[in-house]
Amino acid sequence: MIQQAQFNVQMAEEDRWLTQYPNMEMIVNNKGPKPIFPELNFNITGLEEKSRYVVLLSIQKFDNIRYGFKNGKWGPSKVRHATKKEQEIKYFLHPDGTKLGEELMKETIKFDTVRITNHKKFMDKDNVFFVETMHKYVPVLTVKNITNVESANHSMRMEVAQFFPVTVYNQESIGNWKSKFHKNATFENRLDGGNKRKNTNSREEPSSKRSKNETEIAVLDILQVASQSENYNESTNSGRLQNEISSSIHQFPSTSYQNQYPHAYPTVNTPPIYAQQFPAPFDEKQNQFYPKTDENLAPNCAQDASSLPNFAMNQKASFANQYPYHPYYHQYSQLDHGSPYQYMNNSINSDSSFQSSFSTENSYFDDNGNPIHYPYYPYK
């Protein structure tokens, strides 16, 4: 427990820090900022309950000594000396911002997003602290009472959490110990001779990253399939990308699935398929609509609701979010005899943007479940 007159602070994971105290090591390298493990989590007591506070964290040098690792031990280096330039102290404000003292004392204050690096090119982020290898560092917690602006800042050096930044673990036991608790812990260790090795108990995981050539080939394959799509209709500039683009995509039986769920196979620039877009009678035997001709149009362009399949009648209610009303279509109304029909705004005839972005053709399906495009017939 670290104490001061105003309040008390304790590391939430103090037991883990003590297992390697005072020689904890943290990996840093040129691959990017690295997390600190065990994490920097704190419990605070002794605050004024109704005052508001901000909590800040900094990573500061423990001393001005340059260390070395020899004969299995850390100690002051007899060959190299510490840098004389003083390091600028950087503070990281806790993401939660201001909180009441009673709130801070009820919860664990976590700085799990803090990272460290030994390359200044990664210093552009607020949560990244620059550290030098072969030096010892200590986290410092600062608590500021912003309700009473005249009160002084109070800082705590969390000496139980002191650590050495290293590019590889000098103590093999630390790498093994961290791997038990932290899934991202590295197994790299340094032998007495200065060589790197991987822990023999670790298993090599196959890389999931594609090489540049593999990625380019995959992209070309997708573009080739898209350009050769059999369902591409040049006359209406409509088509859809085949499921065969990737063998990992689940394949559905095309005929039965399209007949039951035509919304799952939409075509580009084609209106949503609603019941009101099928004024032609439905052939139950062939499971499709009759070709839309003047003879097959329902009288007065009113649909015979009983001739429509259930999936068409229920589409609007079942898939309202996927297929909202198009702005050029009015809402549906009822004729005196109760059959629904559709209004259309005549402004589409003079609206070039509409004609270029929205086709007035409807999609039906043939015996094989493939879309058939019929021209739009104006109502009588």
Swiss-Prot record:
Residues 188-215 are annotated as: Disordered. Keywords: DNA-binding, Nucleus, Transcription, Transcription regulation. InterPro entries: p53-like_TF_DNA-bd_sf (IPR008967), T-box_DNA-bd (IPR046360), T-box_sf (IPR036960), TF_T-box (IPR001699), TF_T-box_CS (IPR018186). Residues 189-215 have a biased composition (Basic and acidic residues). One of its GO terms (cellular component) is chromatin. One of its GO terms (biological process) is positive regulation of DNA-templated transcription. It is found in: Nucleus. Residues 11-192 bind DNA. This is Putative T-box protein 40. It comes from Caenorhabditis elegans. The gene is tbx-40.
